Amino acid sequence: MDSIDSIPIIDIGEINEANGAKIDKLVKQIRHTYGEIGFAYLINHNIDPNLVENLFQKSYEFHCLPYETKMKIELNELHRGFIPINTSTDRNSKFAEVTKPNQSESFIMMREANEDDPAVQKGDFLAGPNQWPLEIRGFRKTLTSYFDAMTKLCQKICSVIAIALGTDPVSFAAEFEPPTTFLRLLRYPPIPPDTPNEIYGSAPHSDFGCITLLAQDKTGGLQVMNRQGNWIDSPYIKDTFIMNFGDMLQRWSNGLFVSTPHRVINNSGQERYSCPFFYEPNINAKVSPLNSCITAKNPRKFESIDYGEFLRTELQSGYDRHSTTDKT
């Protein structure tokens, strides 16, 4: 297998096309890229660049707030709010022995679910309202607009993924109804040059769910591990998102798609800002390899799991806020 030493670029402009030949080309690119490196830059995604710029502005404004102000909306049991530095550790990492917390802080929101939402009425894990800082004008509106736009884009991408996996797009979409979705506004302080190797902005890990769409600034620091175990830089490219697949999609695809390890090391000497959006299965989904992905040459590799319980375990392991909650 040839070594991949750069992140490929995929043009998804055809995702809105009815032209079968154009969709077929995109499907083939998805199959190849996410069966090998598992990361790509997306171009022609049709997300307004002004919306992305406004999102980063609101992120900057949030992280400039006094610590005491941000702590008014500290991360709660619904996994929403402010995550202070030194409170998140990738203890379950399969790719490094992680003992130190990530050197980042963030704001996180999820799908808004009020009292009359069916998920809240059923008592679904993490269902509930978001926490919002009241000090920043337009914060909620900007984040909600971006969140909604990214949700719609991921729904379209899921249709292409279903075709790539040989399964029915409508049936596959039902596994995300409604989806579990997260938007994080991350700030990574610069790590001094003499910092020990076990200190990361974000320790080596794979993502939990299905699709991650990352908007990042020009600072750099994101690295992706290729099949040979080498770390590849993923620098900023204007008007792109970096898309990677997570553990649930690797399971659904029976290993045909890879959930690739990645990390952040911010030795730039300046702050790094990034805004990842996570699109994951419905919290009650049962995730097991699709029949279309099980063959004589690719026998079943994974058992069925409950996504919500898997996510609960990961959050309890990785976040101080959840590790102090009742795990029974």
Predicted regions and their residues:
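Peripheral, non-catalytic segments flanking oxidoreductase cores
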Residues: 1-328
